[in-house]
Amino acid sequence: MALYYDHQIEAPDAAGSPSFISWHPVHPFLAVAYISTTSTGSVDIYLEQGECVPDTHVERPFRVASLCWHPTRLVLAVGWETGEVTVFNKQDKEQHTMPLTHTADITVLRWSPSGNCLLSGDRLGVLLLWRLDQRGRVQGTPLLKHEYGKHLTHCIFRLPPPGEDLVQLAKAAVSGDEKALDMFNWKKSSSGSLLKMGSHEGLLFFVSLMDGTVHYVDEKGKTTQVVSADSTIQMLFYMEKREALVVVTENLRLSLYTVPPEGKAEEVMKVKLSGKTGRRADIALIEGSLLVMAVGEAALRFWDIERGENYILSPDEKFGFEKGENMNCVCYCKVKGLLAAGTDRGRVAMWRKVPDFLGSPGAEGKDRWALQTPTELQGNITQIQWGSRKNLLAVNSVISVAILSERAMSSHFHQQVAAMQVSPSLLNVCFLSTGVAHSLRTDMHISGVFATKDAVAVWNGRQVAIFELSGAAIRSAGTFLCETPVLAMHEENVYTVESNRVQVRTWQGTVKQLLLFSETEGNPCFLDICGNFLVVGTDLAHFKSFDLSRREAKAHCSCRSLAELVPGVGGIASLRCSSSGSTISILPSKADNSPDSKICFYDVEMDTVTVFDFKTGQIDRRETLSFNEQETNKSHLFVDEGLKNYVPVNHFWDQSEPRLFVCEAVQETPRSQPQSANGQPQDGRAGPAADVLILSFFISEEHGFLLHESFPRPATSHSLLGMEVPYYYFTRKPEEADREDEVEPGCHHIPQMVSRRPLRDFVGLEDCDKATRDAMLHFSFFVTIGDMDEAFKSIKLIKSEAVWENMARMCVKTQRLDVAKVCLGNMGHARGARALREAEQEPELEARVAVLATQLGMLEDAEQLYRKCKRHDLLNKFYQAAGRWQEALQVAEHHDRVHLRSTYHRYAGHLEASADCSRALSYYEKSDTHRFEVPRMLSEDLPSLELYVNKMKDKTLWRWWAQYLESQGEMDAALHYYELARDHFSLVRIHCFQGNVQKAAQIANETGNLAASYHLARQYESQEEVGQAVHFYTRAQAFKNAIRLCKENGLDDQLMNLALLSSPEDMIEAARYYEEKGVQMDRAVMLYHKAGHFSKALELAFATQQFVALQLIAEDLDETSDPALLARCSDFFIEHSQYERAVELLLAARKYQEALQLCLGQNMSITEEMAEKMTVAKDSSDLPEESRRELLEQIADCCMRQGSYHLATKKYTQAGNKLKAMRALLKSGDTEKITFFASVSRQKEIYIMAANYLQSLDWRKEPEIMKNIIGFYTKGRALDLLAGFYDACAQVEIDEYQNYDKAHGALTEAYKCLAKAKAKSPLDQETRLAQLQSRMALVKRFIQARRTYTEDPKESIKQCELLLEEPDLDSTIRIGDVYGFLVEHYVRKEEYQTAYRFLEEMRRRLPLANMSYYVSPQAVDAVHRGLGLPLPRTVPEQVRHNSMEDARELDEEVVEEADDDP
C-alpha cells in the first residue's frame, strides 16, 4: 500500500503565479514558468522535493509562452511571447538565445526524437527547424522554414519505420542509390529551404493550424495538407501501432486518419464525443488507443478507438470527494498504471489500472480501473503531469505547484497494538485487546512507525515522536531530533541507529547505552523486537541479537555474517527473531538487490542455518563446522506444486509461541489465471488468491521445518501485519476499510484499517482460555508432524463439542479422514459418519474430504476440493444440492457435459416446483424431456397445452395430443393430429376401427409402415381375405404368418418366395413342406442350401440327381464343413473332371496328400494359394512333424519341377531343408534374395554356394558383390576358394587395368588364404603355394623395376630385360607391358635402333597383339621416323583375357557344386 507525499516547491517571493510546468523525461527536474503581476516572465527548475536548483533562474520582461525539455540532456527550451527562443543548459548554467526570426508568440516548441534539432512555430504561422549542438547552441541557419500564415497550434513527430538501418543506407548512398541519397539529403522544395538531415533523425512531423488544417512535412521537407477539420483542433495524437493520426476538435469531434509514408491521409473513422463544449478540454491518449478527456465535468470520459466503446469514471464521495467536484486535467503514468486527474477543489484523483491477473475475468471498461485514495491540495488544479524516470507527479494549482512522490505506507503490529498509516501525517492506532481505535495526527510526514502496548513511536528520518495512551486519548510523551532510518521500542527504551552503533534512548531522547558494531560488520539498518529479544541487521549483511530482559541489553549471540553462512546471497532485506530468541529469520536479497526466493533461519544455540527456497520448495540445512566449511542436508517441503515459484515479502514470528512462524509470499511472475469458457477461474480461486499466499510453519530443532497452513491472502486485505495466536492480522485496503458488510469469509472485522483471521485450528475457539489454547497448539503441532498419539493425548481432557468440531474442520485442511472419523464420533455426528463411509468408494482423496467438508458446513472448502480433483460431476451435484443452480449449469455446460441434460431436467423440476412454469418449460426443452414432461406439467391447463403442442410442431407431442383426443372419443380430431405426427399405424388402426378398410389399405401401401401393414393383414385374415392378408403380412415382413397362410391354403408359388425372404428356420420348414409333398424337390434342395443345412441339401441332391444344385452347394463348403461331405463332393468333382474344385475340397477336408497326389497325377500347377493351404501349421495335430516336413518337401519338389523357384524356396525353408532351399533360390537367379538368404541361414555350405553364384556375376563392376563374395567365403571357411577369387582379382587388375600394385596385393591375400586353408591334398596345396609365390615375385620385380626407373634407369631397364628371359612370364605379367616400358625408355633416349629391335621382338612374341595397346602410337611413330622406316598399320587386338575365362570356369564350378550336393 502506498501514499503520496506532497512537497510544495520553494518558489521565489517575486516569482508570481505559475503558468506552465514541464518535467524532464529522464531526470527528476521540474521546470516551472511564472508570470508576475507586472507581466514579467521567469522560469525556475526544482528538485523532486521542491528545492529550487541554484543558478537556474531565467527571466525576461515578457511572459513565457512554452517550455520543452531535451529528450535526454539537461537542456531546456523556453519560448517567449515576443518570439524569442532561449535554450538553457542546466549543466553549464548557460543561456543561449536563438536568432530572432519569430516576431510573435511561440506556440509550438518541440525537440526532435533524437534531440539534435529544435522545432519552433509562432502565432503568425512561421515554422523553423534548427540544428543544435550538445550544449544547446544553434548550428548555422534554420534547416527548414515554412510560412503557413495562420496560428500554429500543435506539432507531433512521426517516428521513422524501424527497418531503416543508417549504416546500410550510408553504404547504399555511397554506391549511388538515388533513394538512399534522397533519404540523406532533403532536396529543395517550393515552400522550404534545403534540409541536410536523414530520416533516421525522425524528422517527419505533423503541424496543425488554428483554421483546423493539419499539414504533413516529409523527409524531403515538403509540406502537404492532409486534414481539414470543421473547427479548431484541440488535440493531435499519432498512433504508432496503426500508423494513424487522431484529431480532436474544439466541438469534440474525433477523426482517425491513416497516414502512409508518402503522407496522403485517409479518414477511416469520425465520431462525435460526449462532453461539455465551450472550454478547453485536457485529453490524453493512453494504452495506445484509449482516449481520456477531462472537460470540466464531474467525471472523466473514455473512448476506446479500437473497440469503439465509451464509458466514464466518476470519483466516489466516500473517498472524500465533494458533490459537483469537476475534473480539469488528466495525465497517465504507463509504468505504474496510474491515471491522475486534477479537480477544481484542489484534489488529485487517481485510478489504478487493475492487472489482468487480479481483475475479474473479462473485465472491461470502467471495471478495469480502481479508484485510489485522493491527495488533497489547495486551489484550482489546472495542470498535472507525470515525469522523470522516478515517475513523479507535478500539480499546478495556479497559486502554487506541488510535487507528489509515492512512498510505502507504514504499519506495525506488536503486543496487541496495531498502527496503520492512512495519510502522510495521519495514523490509525488500534488497541486490539479492547477494540478501541484512535486517530493520531502528527506534524511530520511519517516514514516509519513502531507500536507497543504502552506507546507508539513515529519518525521521518530527522525527528522522532513518542505518544502514549492516557485514559481514552493518546498524548505526546516525548520528541527529539534523531536522523535514524529505523527505530524499535521495548518497555521504556527506544532503540535508534547511527553509524556503526545502536543507541538505547529514553522517550525523551537521552542516550542510555550504546550497542557498538565494527566497521567490518557495517552500519545497523534493520531492527526487530519479539518478546525480550532485539535483533539487529547491518548494511554489510551481518546480524546480531541482544537479550533485553535485564536493565541493560546483553549480547545473545555473536555477530554473524550472512554471506559466510549462505554463500551467494547479496544482502539483508529484513530480519525477525522468535519470542524465545532461539531462531532468527532473514529475508536475503540477491547480488543485484532484487528480491530472493529464499528465506534463512539461523539457530542461535546450534549455530546452524536452514535455507528454505520458496521457488523450489527445497530445504537446505547447513551445519557450520569449526574449520569454516559446511555440511548440507537437502530435502523437499512442498508436495503441492501450486505452492512453488513464490517469493517471500513479509515474515513474522508469533509473539508468544516460539515455534510458530508465518510469511507472506507473492508469485514470482504474476500470471493470468487459466479460465474456463464461462470466464470463471478453473480452480475456483479469485485473482489475488492465486498470486499472494499466506503460509504458516512450525519450526523446531527436533522436527525441522513443517508446513502448517497455506491460504490465499484475503481479497480485502493489503498485506500481512503479524500474528499472535489465535489470529493472523492484516492491513485492510483503504477502499475496504468501511465495508462492514463485505468481510472476507473467515475474517473478523476490527474497526478502521486492521482485519484478522483465525488460525485454521482455532476457528470457533477464538475466545478459549489459555489452557485450551496451549492444548490446541500442541495438538496442531503433533498433527503437523504426523504423531497422532501425542496429538490425541494433548486434547483428551477437552470435552467441548466445539473443540472436536474444530478438529474435524482441521481434518478437512489436513485431509486426515482417519482422524475425522474419531472427531465425528465424539461429536455424535451420525449423518456425517455415514456420508464419510459411503464416500470411501470415490477414488480421489479430495472428493472424499469434500464430503466431510459438506457435512461440516464448510461449503467453500468442499467446492475448492471438488475443483482441485476435477470431479465436476460431484461439483455439479454439490451446486444442485446447495440450490446454486446457475453455477451448476455453468459447470455442466463447460466441464460436465455428460450430465448436462440431467442438470437441465432437475433445474426445470426446481423451477416447476417454484411455479415458474415458463422457464421450467424452456429447460425441459433443453433437457429434451419436454415431450412427456411438458404435457404432464400442463395437464391441468389444456388450452395452454394445446397452444404449446401446435406451436412446437413436434411429432411426439402431436401423437401425445392425438392419443389424448382419441381417449376422449374425438376420432376426427385425433386423425388430424395422427396425420400431422405421421403416425400411420394409428391412422390405419382408427380407419379399421371405423370400418374404412380401403382407406387403411391405401395408407399402408403408400407408407409401407410395418406396424400398419401388420395390423391391416390381421384385419384381412379375420375377414378370410387370404390374398390380401398374405400381401400385407409380406409388407410387414411378418413372413412366418404369410408362410403359415400359404401352407394352409396351398399357395406353393408364393411360399417359395416368402421362404427365401424369411429366416433360416422358416426356410427349413418350407423345405420340409416341399419334401413331404414329394414334388418340386429342387425347391427343397435350394431352401435347405440357403438355410445352411448343407448335409440335408447334399443328401437330397444326390438322391434326386440334381447335379447343378450340387455344384452350387459345393461352392459354399469350406474347412468348417463336415469332412465326410467334403470328401463326397470332391469325389463327385473328380468323376466329372473338375480337378481344381476337387483339390480345394480335399484341402478343406485336410486331406493334403490326396490333394497333392491329385495335382501330380493331373499335372496341375500348384499356385501359391494352394501351397499355403497345403501347408500344415507347425503345432498342428493333423500331421506328425516328420510327415509335415515330408509333405512340405514334396510340395517344394513339385514347385521346382514347374519352375516356381521362390515358392519352392519357401517350402524347403518351412521344411527345414535350407540347402535345397538355396539351390531353388540359385535357380531363380534373384541375387538380392540369395544374398539375404545366405546371410540369415548361417550355414557353411550355403555361404559357399552363394559366393560361387556371385562369382558368376559381373563382380568387377559391383563392389558390393565382391564384398559379399569375400565375406561368404570367409564365413564358409572356404579359404582355398577365396584364394582362387583373389587370384582372379589379381588377373583382372593386370589384364584390364594394368595395376600391378593392386594385383600384387590380391596375390598376397590369395597366398595368405591358401596357406591357412585345410587342403585335402597337401602336395597340391604346396604346388599352388609355390606357383603363387613365383607369380608374386615376378610381379614384385616388375613393380620394383618401374619404381626405380627415376633413380636408376639403367638398373630398371636391366631388370626388365631379365624379366623377358623368365619362362612362363606371360601367365603372370603381360609381356607387352614390359616391352612397352623398354620401348618408351629408348625412345626418350633417342636410341631408335634398340627401340626398333624391341618392337620387332614384341611383334614376334605377340603376333596378334595391337602394338598401340602396349606402346603409344607417338613412340612407334618416333621410332620409325628416326630410322626412316615406313609407318606400320594398326592390327585389331585379339588378346586372351584370363579374367573372362576364370569367370566362365567359376560359373561351371558353381553349377557342378549345385548338382553334386545331396
From Swiss-Prot:
User: Which GO biological process annotations does it have?
Assistant: cilium assembly; determination of left/right symmetry; embryonic brain development; embryonic camera-type eye development; embryonic cranial skeleton morphogenesis; embryonic digit morphogenesis; heart development; intraciliary retrograde transport
What does the UniProt record say this protein does? Component of the IFT complex A (IFT-A), a complex required for retrograde ciliary transport and entry into cilia of G protein-coupled receptors (GPCRs). Plays a pivotal role in proper development and function of ciliated cells through its role in ciliogenesis and/or cilium maintenance. Required for the development and maintenance of the outer segments of rod and cone photoreceptor cells. Plays a role in maintenance and the delivery of opsin to the outer segment of photoreceptor cells.
The record's keywords, sorted A to Z, are:
Cell projection, Ciliopathy, Cilium, Cilium biogenesis/degradation, Cytoplasm, Cytoskeleton, Disease variant, Phosphoprotein, Repeat, Retinitis pigmentosa, TPR repeat, WD repeat
Spell out which residues are annotated as carrying Phosphoserine.
360, 1443
State the protein's name.
Answer: Intraflagellar transport protein 140 homolog
Q: A Gene Ontology CC term for this entry?
A: mitochondrion
* Record field: compositional bias (Basic and acidic residues): 1438-1447
Q: How does it assemble?
A: Component of the IFT complex A (IFT-A). IFT-A complex is divided into a core subcomplex composed of IFT122:IFT140:WDR19 which is associated with TULP3 and a peripheral subcomplex composed of IFT43:WDR35:TTC21B. Interacts (via C-terminal region) with IFT122 (via C-terminal region). Interacts with TTC25. Interacts with TTC21A.
Q: What's the impact of mutating residue 311 to C?
A: In SRTD9; partial to complete loss of basal body localization and increase of cytoplasmic localization
Record's superkingdom? Answer: Eukaryota
> Where would I find the TPR repeats?
772-807, 869-904, 906-934, 955-988, 1010-1043, 1078-1111, 1123-1156, 1189-1222, 1376-1409
Keyword Repeat included in the entry's annotation: yes
Annotated consequence of substituting residue 871 to C: In RP80; uncertain significance
- Quote the annotated effect of residue 1360 to R: In SRTD9; disease phenotype consistent with Mainzer-Saldino syndrome
Matches recorded under PANTHER family: IFT140/172-RELATED (PTHR15722), INTRAFLAGELLAR TRANSPORT PROTEIN 140 HOMOLOG (PTHR15722:SF7)
User: Can you name the source organism?
Assistant: Homo sapiens (Human)
Sequence ranges of the WD repeats:
4-48, 51-90, 93-132, 139-188, 221-259, 266-305, 322-361
Q: What is its main location?
A: cytoplasm
* Keyword Cytoplasm (UniProt): yes
Q: Where in the cell is it found?
A: Cytoplasm, Cytoskeleton, Cilium basal body; Cytoplasm, Cytoskeleton, Microtubule organizing center, Centrosome; Cell projection, Cilium
Please name the disease the record associates with this protein: Short-rib thoracic dysplasia 9 with or without polydactyly: A form of short-rib thoracic dysplasia, a group of autosomal recessive ciliopathies that are characterized by a constricted thoracic cage, short ribs, shortened tubular bones, and a 'trident' appearance of the acetabular roof. Polydactyly is variably present. Non-skeletal involvement can include cleft lip/palate as well as anomalies of major organs such as the brain, eye, heart, kidneys, liver, pancreas, intestines, and genitalia.
Q: Which PROSITE patterns does the entry mention?
A: WD_REPEATS_2 (PS50082), WD_REPEATS_REGION (PS50294)
Return the Acidic residues bias intervals.
1448-1462
Disordered, as annotated region: 1434-1462
Its gene is IFT140
